[in-house]
């Protein structure tokens, strides 16, 4: 009897304590409200706000597969397949000086499973017309086809520049670091060893002026290589005529330098035919006076060099939106060397 009473008393005590235990139970916290990604349409399509900030970000890039063709282009082989992936991040935000822009471009290249590289293709900041960082110069611009050879050997520099823009017109000036540019020097006739006249190039000054006027677009670009004490100037323009666009360009170099070293002068022409909404065919031609051929080790002048001419054809086809195919073939015939035929076939998916 006593045992029964003890058990009943214990059960009653346990039942009485149950509300206290319930009050002490762990309660799950309310979930924080989620801030979904918001579209930013202030700077064009593709931008979104970085959550918690007023900075707009755009992510774009492409995947490219390409087969190059030419004599020994792949070492002992006359063809070589390569693949590239590129991603670009562009950040923009409003300031009292106008939009503040930052760009980072990463590029990944693969010749095969073991021969690969990852490079910083561009990284710069831009505000109120001023730009500083690693970016391509105006000398990287060219005609739309693949035949013209009117640019620098190296067009990607650590630079600082100012560019004024007003509607369809722009004009700018840049100071470029040229330490990976062109070196003037001499070649020993016995050993064939090249000896540079000076150390690494350290600075160059370039300008660019361009714009559009109706169906006509134009650009004038110049550059002075301080170490080599030579410069170059180039003019090019395009105009819509008939079913396509005519492009013309001319360049002059006072001596081999980091802005232009292929020849003392050259002229180029192309006609980009828009055959259909998806197909473009571009035949082109270029003539060089006192042709050297480019490279980073160059003579002190162009004296005694022969001329050269080049013809080519480029075909662009849009398979579907953001998916393109391109084929190009080029023939070069220099007076002082062997002629050559090169080309490539490319597939590219952009996003």
Regions found by a protein language model. Give the residues of each.
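N-terminal periplasmic/intermembrane-space "pro-region" immediately following the signal or transit peptide
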Residues: 1-60
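Detector for outer-membrane/organellar transmembrane beta-barrel domains
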Residues: 200-310
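Outer-membrane beta-barrel "beta-signal"
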Residues: 4, 18-21, 239, 317-319, ...
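Outer membrane beta-barrel
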Residues: 46-181, 208-212
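Gram-negative outer-membrane beta-barrel proteins
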Residues: 67-73, 95, 110-114, 138-142, ...
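Transmembrane beta-barrel strands of outer-membrane/channel proteins
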Residues: 63-67, 104-108, 132-136, 173-177, ...
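Hydrophobic, lipid-facing positions within transmembrane beta-strands of outer-membrane proteins
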Residues: 83-87, 121-123, 128, 156-160, ...
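Repeated loop/turn-to-beta-strand initiation elements of outer-membrane beta-barrel proteins
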Residues: 96-99, 129-132, 168-173, 213-220, ...
């Amino acid at each position: 009897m006593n045992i029964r009473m003890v058990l009943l008393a214990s059960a009653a005590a346990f039942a009485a304590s149950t509300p206290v235990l319930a009050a002490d139970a762990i309660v799950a916290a309310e979930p924080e409200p989620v801030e979904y990604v918001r579209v930013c349409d202030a700077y064009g399509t593709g931008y979104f706000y970085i959550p918690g900030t007023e900075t707009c970000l755009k992510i774009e890039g492409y995947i490219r597969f390409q087969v190059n063709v030419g004599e020994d282009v792949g070492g002992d082989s006359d063809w070589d397949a390569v693949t590239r992936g590129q991603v670009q991040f562009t950040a923009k935000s409003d300031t009292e000086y106008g939009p503040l822009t930052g760009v980072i471009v990463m590029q990944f290249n693969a010749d095969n499973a073991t021969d690969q590289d990852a490079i910083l293709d561009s990284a710069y900041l831009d505000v109120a017309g001023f730009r500083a960082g690693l970016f391509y110069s105006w000398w990287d611009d060219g005609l739309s086809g693949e035949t013209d050879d009117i640019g620098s050997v190296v067009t990607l520099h650590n630079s600082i520049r100012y560019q004024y823009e007003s509607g369809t017109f722009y004009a700018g000036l840049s100071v470029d670091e040229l330490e990976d540019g062109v070196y003037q020097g001499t070649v020993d006739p016995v050993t064939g060893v090249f000896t540079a006249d000076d150390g690494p190039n350290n600075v160059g000054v370039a300008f660019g002026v361009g714009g559009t006027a109706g169906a006509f677009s134009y650009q004038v670009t110049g550059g002075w290589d301080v170490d080599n004490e030579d410069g170059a100037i180039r003019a090019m323009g395009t105009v819509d005529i008939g079913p396509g666009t005519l492009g013309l360009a001319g360049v002059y170099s006072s001596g081999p330098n980091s802005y232009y070293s292929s020849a003392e002068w050259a002229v180029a022409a192309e006609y980009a035919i828009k055959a259909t909404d998806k197909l473009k065919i571009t035949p082109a031609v270029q003539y060089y006076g006192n042709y050297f051929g480019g490279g980073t080790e160059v003579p002190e002048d162009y004296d005694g060099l022969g001329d050269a001419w080049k013809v080519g054809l480029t075909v662009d086809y849009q398979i579907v939106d953001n998916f393109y195919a391109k084929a190009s073939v080029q023939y070069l015939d220099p007076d002082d060397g062997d002629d050559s035929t090169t080309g490539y076939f490319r597939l590219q998916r952009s996003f």
